[in-house]
């Protein structure tokens, strides 16, 4: 192990999302989001479940805060349920005081315990009423105004205690999984809608950031940014075709959001392939969008090998996987087909982002679902050897990126604090460092939680 340490200011903790943990879908005035609706559609969720109960964190949040405290974290990243705060979502719709009070109390408790809140405004749960009213993210003018209004209410209600804001979590997933292949809510299948939705989300993000900077930043002193998801990508072999495919895949996954937000324009390969199906920014919009994130929020889990080909335009006509040309695997297989352990890729990705986009990086999600863990009794599930090995590799890569390569990485959040509702997989896949018995809601720390607590204690300057 390296003797080098992360700076004293480095923050670490765990991340969650409202729909994955809260439950209580209609308690205290909350109304449905598109995920409540989507879960009711037959065949959409692998085990036929929903987030109706999840980890019951709307009621058990104090227990969650105490768990965070016991793990010694410095920060906690969580998301707000828009339809808990403005049940019907719109700028003319009534505000739900009970929803604001709930989050205010949670934030106050975190601050009291010395845990810094990192608050995500949108983690995929659009109020259903807005989807019904005007098609949600497909409607540029309406969606931007309603999101900005919601953001403003959150800045007003919580901004005196919250210094770290994230507008959107993983717009790639929202647009591609929600509007491209239909695997996630609202379940649309289209080859044009994802580009429209992406475009509108980038603009909604930029409008919310401008509002924060104009009206709140000076008195509240916080920072605001966005979280993008990306794997590290490596050419499958040494051919020019694989190298070009890798660059193209990176633009289609990451560049489609990062380039406009940090550089002010869409990447060249996307423009070339999509032509006039790619919406254009006006000069005024470019000015608004460019530089609209104070940091780079990164969700990353794995590395993929890339080769040219395939019919998937949303991915950039590439094929990806974990099997090398010689038949060996990149790393340990997880419970999700797309995820294997590969620590070196994490180090390379951190270096790439820091250099390419010139902003401090916060790793806002990183984690591993152990293969078959859901089938194990709790006594075995907590002895999560593969997850511990994953975190050992990834924390070491983080340390090397910061202390050896000089990458400006300022925070790290493990996914997730708890086993929870894993979207289309339902409750079959477990990402938590804390085991949850869904029958009783009993929380039991896994060995990986112990490992991370110890590692960060040893590797952050006193």
Curated annotation (Swiss-Prot):
What is the scientific name of the source organism? Phanerodontia chrysosporium (White-rot fungus)
Q: Which GO terms describe its molecular function?
A: beta-glucosidase activity; cellobiose glucosidase activity
What's the Enzyme Commission number for this chain? 3.2.1.21
- Entry-linked InterPro entries: Glyco_hydro_1, Glyco_hydro_1_beta-glucosidase, Glyco_hydro_1_N_CS, Glycoside_hydrolase_SF
What keywords are assigned to this protein? Carbohydrate metabolism, Cellulose degradation, Glycosidase, Hydrolase, Polysaccharide degradation
- List the active site: 170, 365
Thylakoid: is it a keyword of this entry? no
The reaction(s) annotated as catalysed by this protein in its Swiss-Prot or TrEMBL entry are: Hydrolysis of terminal, non-reducing beta-D-glucosyl residues with release of beta-D-glucose
Write out the similarity annotation.
Belongs to the glycosyl hydrolase 1 family.
Substituting residue 177 to L results in: Small decrease in affinity for cellobiose
Q: Does the keyword Kinase apply?
A: no
Q: How does activity depend on pH?
A: Optimum pH is 6.0-6.5.
Biological processes annotated in GO:
cellulose catabolic process
Induction section of the entry: Expressed constitutively in cellobiose and glucose cultures.
The entry's substrate-binding residues are 20, 123, 169, 301, 415, 422-423
Q: What is the effect of changing residue 229 to N?
A: 17-fold decrease in affinity for cellobiose and displays more acidic optimum pH than wild-type. No effect on optimum pH
Gene3D superfamilies registered for this protein in UniProt: Glycosidases (3.20.20.80)
Changing residue 173 to C: what effect? 2-fold decrease in affinity for cellobiose
Can you name this protein? Beta-glucosidase 1A
- Write out the function statement from the record: Plays an important role in cellulose degradation. Shows hydrolytic activity against several glycosidic compounds.
């Amino acid at each position: 192990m390296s003797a080098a340490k992360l700076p004293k200011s480095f923050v670490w903790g765990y991340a969650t999302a409202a729909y994955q943990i809260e439950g209580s879908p209609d308690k205290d005035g909350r109304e449905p989001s598109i995920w409540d609706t989507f879960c009711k559609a037959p065949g959409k969720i692998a085990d036929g479940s929903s987030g109706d109960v999840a980890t019951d964190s709307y009621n058990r949040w104090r227990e969650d805060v105490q768990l965070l405290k016991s793990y010694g974290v410095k920060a906690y990243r969580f998301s707000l349920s828009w339809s808990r705060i403005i049940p019907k979502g719109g700028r003319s719709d009534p505000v739900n005081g009970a929803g604001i009070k709930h989050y205010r109390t949670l934030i106050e408790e975190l601050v009291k315990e010395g845990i810094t809140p990192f608050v995500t405004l949108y983690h995929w749960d659009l109020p259903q009423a807005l989807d019904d009213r005007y098609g949600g993210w497909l409607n540029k003018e309406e969606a931007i105004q309603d999101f900005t209004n919601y953001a403003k209410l959150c800045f007003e209600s919580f901004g005196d205690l919250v210094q770290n804001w994230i507008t959107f979590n993983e717009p790639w997933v929202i647009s591609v999984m929600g509007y491209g292949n239909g695997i996630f809510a609202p379940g649309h299948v289209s080859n044009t809608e994802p580009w429209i939705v992406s475009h509108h989300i980038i603009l909604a993000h930029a409008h919310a950031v401008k509002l924060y900077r104009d009206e709140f930043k000076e008195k509240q002193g916080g920072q605001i940014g966005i979280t993008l998801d990306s794997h590290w990508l490596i050419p499958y072999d040494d051919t020019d075709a694989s190298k070009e495919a890798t660059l193209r895949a990176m633009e289609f996954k990451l560049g489609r959001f990062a380039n406009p937000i940090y550089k002010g324009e869409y990447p060249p390969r996307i423009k070339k392939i999509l032509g006039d199906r790619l919406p254009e920014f006006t000069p005024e919009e470019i000015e608004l969008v460019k530089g609209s994130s104070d940091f780079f929020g990164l969700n990353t889990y794995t590395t993929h090998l890339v080769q040219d080909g395939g019919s998937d335009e949303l991915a950039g006509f590439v094929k990806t996987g974990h099997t090398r040309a010689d038949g060996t695997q990149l790393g340990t297989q997880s419970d999700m087909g797309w995820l294997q352990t590969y620590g070196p890729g994490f180090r390379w990705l951190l270096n790439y982002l820091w250099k390419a986009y010139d902003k401090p990086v916060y790793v806002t999600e990183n984690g591993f679902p152990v293969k078959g863990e859901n089938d194990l009794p709790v006594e075995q599930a907590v002895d999560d050897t593969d997850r511990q090995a994953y975190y050992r590799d990834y924390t070491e890569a983080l340390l090397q990126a910061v202390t050896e390569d000089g990458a400006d990485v300022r925070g790290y959040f493990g996914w997730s604090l708890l086993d929870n509702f894993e979207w289309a997989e339902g409750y079959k896949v477990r990402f938590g460092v804390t085991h949850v018995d869904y029958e009783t809601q009993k929380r039991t720390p896994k060995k990986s939680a112990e490992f991370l607590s110890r590692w960060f204690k040893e590797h952050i300057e006193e």
